[in-house]
Curated annotation (Swiss-Prot):
An essential GTPase which binds GTP, GDP and possibly (p)ppGpp with moderate affinity, with high nucleotide exchange rates and a fairly low GTP hydrolysis rate. Plays a role in control of the cell cycle, stress response, ribosome biogenesis and in those bacteria that undergo differentiation, in morphogenesis control. The keyword Iron-sulfur does not apply. GTP binds at residues 168-175, 193-197, 214-217, 282-285, 314-316. This is GTPase Obg. Its cofactor is Mg(2+). Residues 1-161 form the Obg domain. Keywords: Cytoplasm, GTP-binding, Hydrolase, Magnesium, Metal-binding, Nucleotide-binding. It comes from the Bacteria. Residues 162-333 form the OBG-type G domain. Its EC number is 3.6.5.-. It is an enzyme of class 3 (hydrolase).
């Protein structure tokens, strides 16, 4: 699925209901005392973390979240009903920012299921005239209005909690790999730039769930730094990174120089290069001399700083993919969060 990873929303708590001015009037009680009830409190706006919510698309569709106002007070000492709360469900791994004077001020971070954040408090109820009666004021004419609910502009920024992150140049087989192993079906072709958004997918292998995230190419398409960083952030929580490449057997140095740009970018973003990274050499079925190809692959891996952490796969040969998945599963078992 395409990943909507940020949204700006407006939240507002409901206004408090106003108090009522009323006096008891019955057949044999022409001058009864005050019986104006209080208003209801305005509803609150909450953010809940939800394990079944996977992105922020719903916050792009509905940008305004306004809680219900409290009802006004009524006669016969009847209080108005409180306004209903509004609940915004977000994925686990969402940062919550209040936007004030064009600055993003961190408010909270969702870390587990059903975590709650009160982001806009409803207004306090108004008081009816019955509240103000006293021995010296038996017919109060005063009441109060309900308070206004809080209102804020909020930025939501979601960082996916994946186990394995995929990166590399376009047309290196990342999308094909994701489709072959998981429940995600990204757009695939023999042309570059088909991965334009982060993709998330999951694989159940030997009764173990593995979550993958595939991010677009760092360089191609002339991505600006802020957009590139928006993609790179989804690798932050990964325990393992897979660097997909196509090895040019006719010009190994060209491959190395090209891939060093990816590594430079990776090093520039919050120490991502310190994470375990495996080099995945794709499309090995098109190479004829396997011995020469292996030596070239080893040379490329060493030159990029991966040493012996490289694997060959062919998307036309599921056995090679199954071997890689077994290796990944073993690594994740040995390196639990």
């Amino acid at each position: 699925m395409n990943l909507t990873d940020n949204a700006v929303i407006f939240v507002k708590g409901g206004n408090g209901g106003k108090g009522c001015v009323s006096f008891r009037r019955e057949k044999y009680i022409p001058k009864g005392g005050p019986d104006g009830g209080n208003g209801g409190n305005g509803g609150n706006v909450w953010i809940y973390s939800d394990k079944n919510t996977h992105d922020l698309y719903h916050c792009l569709v509905r940008k305004n979240f306004i809680a219900e106002d409290g009802e006004n007070g009524k006669k016969n000492n009847s209080s108005g009903k409180n306004g209903k709360d509004v609940i915004i469900k977000v994925p686990i791994g969402t940062n919550i920012f209040f936007i004030k004077n064009s600055e993003n001020i961190i408010f909270g971070h969702t870390r587990f299921h059903n975590q709650k954040f009160l982001v806009a408090k409803g207004g306090v109820r108004g008081l009816g005239n019955n509240y103000f009666k006293s021995p010296t004021n038996r017919t109060p004419m005063e009441s109060t209005l309900g308070k206004l609910g809080e209102s804020f502009k909020i930025k939501l920024d979601f960082v996916f909690l994946a186990d394995v992150g995929l990166f590399g140049y376009s047309n290196t087989g990342r999308s094909c790999f994701m489709r072959s192993i998981s429940n995600v079906k990204p757009k695939i072709s023999f042309y570059p730039f088909t991965t334009l958004f982060p993709y998330i997918g999951s694989l159940n292998f030997l009764n173990k769930d593995i979550k993958f995230v595939d991010i677009p190419s760092f360089i191609e398409g002339k991505k600006k730094n802020n957009l590139r960083n928006r993609f790179l952030k989804h690798l932050q929580n990964c325990r393992l990174l897979l660097h997909f490449i196509n090895l040019d057997v006719k010009n190994v140095k060209k491959t190395i120089n090209k891939e060093k740009i990816n590594i430079k970018i990776l090093k520039s973003f919050r120490n991502l290069f310190l994470k375990p990274i495996w080099l995945i050499i794709n499309k090995t079925d098109i190479n004829i001399n396997s011995n020469i190809f292996f030596k070239q692959a080893q040379f490329v891996s060493n030159s990029l700083g991966y040493e012996k952490k490289f694997f060959f796969i062919s998307l036309n040969d599921f056995i090679s993919i199954k071997i890689l998945i077994n290796k990944i599963l073993l690594f994740l078992e040995e390196n639990k969060r």
